[in-house]
Design a protein with these regions (language model features):
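Glycine-rich beta-alpha loop elements in corrinoid/cobalamin-binding modules
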Residues: 1-169, 181
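Flexible, glycine-rich loop/tail regions that form catalytic "lids" or insertion modules at the edges
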Residues: 52-59, 205, 220, 359, ...
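Conserved SAM/AdoMet-binding glycine-rich loop
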Residues: 256-403, 407-411
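Flexible glycine/acidic-rich beta-alpha junction loops that bind and position SAM and/or redox cofactors
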Residues: 2-3, 30-41, 62-70, 241, ...
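Conserved, mostly hydrophobic/aromatic
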Residues: 25, 191, 225, 229, ...
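N-terminal [4Fe-4S]-dependent radical SAM core
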Residues: 145-218
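N-terminal pre-triad scaffold of radical SAM enzymes
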Residues: 205-233, 258, 267
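Terminal amphipathic helices with adjacent charged low-complexity linkers/tails
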Residues: 49-69, 73, 128-157, 166, ...
Length: 535
């Protein structure tokens, strides 16, 4: 995830590509099975790693760029004022340097980032061209260029139309080839067919590992995610195109767990992946998929070209739970509930047979302004899903609950948003125990927002209004306190915040109040009636 210059939260700085820092010869990104096989075969044939600089899904460091490739500048700015969006960052425009220049001051509102070949070629081979990103030195000193580089990087995530990216680090060039093509079902089955031990490494010497206890009987049925949540980097690692195993391969692994895992009790802890309900969901058109530049197939709305039929997943659940020796199949992966709403039969199947009292889902927030920075659906989708969840739970004669997850201090979220979220939680009688505060992770779009205070989902401009970003520790703790409004340890902080916001109407001991009065003040009021001391 650090194949180009990336912001590092722990050092609060932009770090160089890990290729530079590690002095590695080559970096394979993603799951890399195909790239690893190709690399191994080529090395076995006697080739040097330096000769494999065009390997898809790999990044290398070059001292000199190939002369027969065309460079496309993603950041040509006529005046350091604003940067326009890049709907197609490698589209070739045949025009003179002055063509299309603004004629009035009002037209100077945006400065065109028109990619132009720099090697004096009027025509060029699109397959032998690369995009020049702002250098490490530039993105380190210019947050707007960092956001711009992040924007272009994410636009180049579709393996069927992505370009090679190049970023200079002093005198060296980091060359990032396009992402690997997704594995076919047969290849996925092959990857999962090896005789994995399903046990911790012997170096742990029998020590208990809580994380292992959670996943030792779980089965990965797919990889990839087309959700595009900005705080997550799964798409940049596993890809946006879903890669699914065959039903036979999955059933075979369940049977192997049943027969070989010591102490197996009959429960499969999860059938899932990055998301619970994206198994075999792909674009209906290969042609459209090959040219698509969307960052998400489900935001701001579910794409009309996306197959949303959950029946393969429903069928898999039914077969898995009827296997001899299998008492229960749980679904522990996060559910994309807006997608599930497209197939109520799936929701019914899930709620009736595969929820063990609680189902984890992740609305992340209630406020549209913040949700738009996360690329998450409206909270209305949650409300719709909850209605169906409660209905099917009642029909099954089960008392079951949703456990929603929320994030505090996400870029774009201010105290007003967190207050509204807190009131939403109180209205719905949620008292979250485990809550999370946003932390920037490499390559995530939200990390670009955090560092640059700009929104790379839209036009990146120097003079555009910055988005609110919470970096101060006290402010981050305050936002987290809104999520745990019911914890008395947070009441003093929340009372002070509500007073600063002019919302003292939410302080009191009635049901509609968010936090109670200060207990000290209340106890004093029993003895002091507010009359001045005559002495």
């Amino acid at each position: 995830l650090r194949r180009i210059a990336q912001y590092d939260y722990w050092s609060d700085s932009v770090r160089r590509s890990i290729l530079i820092d590690s002095n590695a010869d080559i970096l394979l990104f993603g799951n890399s099975e195909r790239a690893l096989v190709e690399l191994s075969h080529q090395i076995a044939k006697g080739k040097k790693i330096s000769e494999l600089w065009q390997l898809r899904g790999a990044a290398v460091v070059l001292k000199k760029l190939p002369a027969d490739w065309t460079e496309i500048d993603s950041t040509r700015i006529d005046w350091p004022s604003k940067i326009d969006k890049l709907p197609n960052p490698y589209e070739y425009k045949e025009q003179s340097a002055t063509e299309g220049a603004a004629e009035t001051d009002s037209q100077l509102e945006t400065i065109r980032v028109i990619p132009m070949p720099l090697h004096r070629k009027e025509k060029f081979d699109a397959n032998r061209s690369y995009i020049r990103l702002p250098s490490y030195e530039k993105v380190t000193n210019d947050p707007a260029l960092y956001a711009h580089a992040s924007r272009v990087l994410h636009q180049e995530a579709n393996p069927y139309n992505a370009k090679t990216l190049v970023q200079k680090h002093q005198t060296l060039e980091v060359w990032v080839n396009p992402p690997p093509f997704p594995l076919e079902t047969e290849e996925m089955d092959w990857v999962f067919s090896f005789n994995y031990k399903r046990q911790p490494h012997p170096s742990y010497q029998g020590a208990r590992i809580p994380a292992y206890d959670m996943i030792k009987t779980s089965v990965n049925i797919m990889r990839g995610c087309f959700g595009g949540c900005t705080f997550c980097s799964i798409t940049e690692h596993e890809g946006r195109i879903i890669q699914s195993r065959s039903e036979e391969s999955i059933i075979s692994e369940i049977e192997k767990i049943r027969d070989t895992v010591p102490g197996f009790t009959g429960t499969i802890s999860d059938l899932g992946g990055p998301t619970a309900n994206m198994y075999k969901l792909n674009c209906k058109s290969r042609k459209i998929q090959a040219s698509c530049k969307r960052l998400s197939c489900v935001y701001p709305n579910i794409c009309q070209h996306l197959n949303t039929d959950h029946s393969p997943t429903t069928q898999l659940y039914r077969k898995a739970r009827t296997l001899p020796g299998i008492k229960r199949v749980a679904i522990a992966s996060g559910l994309r509930y807006d997608l599930a709403l497209k197939d109520t039969e799936y929701i019914k199947e899930l709620v009736t047979h595969h929820v063990g009292g609680y189902l984890k889902i992740a609305p992340e927030h209630s406020e549209k302004k913040t949700l738009s920075k996360m690329m998450k659906p409206s909270i209305n989708s949650y409300d719709e899903f909850k209605i169906l969840f409660d209905r099917f739970s009642k029909s099954a004669g089960k008392e079951q609950y949703l456990i929603p997850y929320f994030i505090a201090a996400h870029p774009g979220s201010d105290d007003e948003d967190m207050l509204n979220l807190s009131l939403w939680l109180k209205e719905h009688n949620f008292k979250p125990d485990q809550v999370q505060t946003f932390y920037p992770s490499p390559m995530a779009l939200a990390t670009a927002m955090y560092y640059s205070e700009r929104n790379p989902l839209e036009r990146v401009r120097y003079k555009t209004e910055k988005i609110p970003v919470i970096k101060n520790l006290d402010e981050r703790q305050r936002q987290k306190a809104f999520l745990r409004y019911h914890d008395e340890k947070n009441w003093p902080m929340l009372r002070n915040t509500l007073k600063e916001m002019g919302r003292t109407d939410l302080i009191g001991n009635k049901d509609h109040h968010l936090v109670p009065y200060d207990s000290v003040i209340k106890s004093k009021s029993r003895f002091y009636k507010g009359k001045p001391n005559k002495r």
